[in-house]
């Protein structure tokens, strides 16, 4: 864990569609008034999927997006370190339909609180060392699958067949190999998804305590 108290970094990990984004956005919205709109931000690990613009679409769709090698954690670490030092960064934008980064970026200025959310955040010791608190969303995989099918079909233009095939071939095996074991690094394990009110209140209280430290 980082000793720098000027920027509190909270990492939220867990399976795809386990409620990470929901709990991150809830905490963000409920803490904005306390810390200030411009002093809290959310970074999604998905933004740091590797740039695959040099590959054909046929090659891009074969990428195992649930393996740590699919992510540019070097750049994510670099950006977090810059934010902690008080420097602004340009967060990449990733296209789920094109399976690569776009030319757009989102500027982010230094914050008092940064909430990270992503499936593989706790697998990287460099990222863990930058975090002041770590969270694992312990949602049953069958629930995650139902949510993922709905999300990917409705929001990302996927077919149900492709979502189920990906789940069987990479999502579930990679969860067992990488994501589930990373639960051991969580300070807080959250059951029942992103609407767990007690867990949200505990996290908010812990962040407030860290800000006062």
Curated annotation (Swiss-Prot):
The keyword ATP-binding applies. GO terms for biological process: CTP salvage; UMP salvage. One of its GO terms (cellular component) is cytoplasm. Its main location: cytoplasm. Pfam families: PRK. Its EC number is 2.7.1.48. Pathway: Pyrimidine metabolism; CTP biosynthesis via salvage pathway; CTP from cytidine: step 1/3; Pyrimidine metabolism; UMP biosynthesis via salvage pathway; UMP from uridine: step 1/1. SUPFAM superfamilies: P-loop containing nucleoside triphosphate hydrolases (SSF52540). It comes from the Bacteria. It is found in: Cytoplasm. It catalyses: uridine + ATP = UMP + ADP + H(+); cytidine + ATP = CMP + ADP + H(+). Keywords: ATP-binding, Cytoplasm, Kinase, Nucleotide-binding, Transferase. It is an enzyme of class 2 (transferase). GO terms for molecular function: ATP binding; cytidine kinase activity; uridine kinase activity. Belongs to the uridine kinase family. This is Uridine kinase. It comes from Vibrio campbellii (strain ATCC BAA-1116). The lineage of its organism: Bacteria, Pseudomonadati, Pseudomonadota, Gammaproteobacteria, Vibrionales. The gene is udk.
């Amino acid at each position: 864990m980082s000793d720098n108290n000027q920027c509190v970094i909270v990492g939220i990990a867990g399976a795809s569609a386990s409620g990470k984004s929901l709990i991150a956005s809830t905490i963000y919205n409920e803490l904005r008034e306390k810390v200030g709109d411009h002093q809290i931000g959310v970074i999604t690990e998905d933004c740091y999927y590797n740039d695959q613009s040099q590959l054909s679409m046929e090659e891009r769709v074969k990428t195992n997006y649930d393996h740590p090698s699919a992510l540019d954690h070097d750049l994510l670490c670099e950006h977090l370190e810059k934010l902690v030092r008080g420097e602004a960064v340009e967060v990449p934008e990733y296209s789920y339909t094109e399976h690569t980064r776009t030319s757009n970026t989102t500027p982010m200025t230094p914050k008092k609180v940064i909430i990270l959310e992503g499936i593989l955040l706790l697998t990287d010791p460099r990222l863990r060392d930058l975090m002041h608190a770590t969270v694992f969303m312990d949602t049953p995989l069958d629930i995650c699958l139902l949510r993922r099918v709905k999300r990917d079909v409705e929001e990302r233009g996927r077919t149900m067949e492709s979502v189920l095939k990906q789940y069987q071939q990479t999502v579930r095996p990679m969860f067992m190999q990488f994501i589930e074991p990373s639960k051991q690094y969580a300070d807080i394990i959250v059951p029942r998804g992103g609407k767990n009110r007690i867990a949200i209140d505990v996290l908010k209280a812990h962040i407030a305590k860290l800000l006062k430290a």
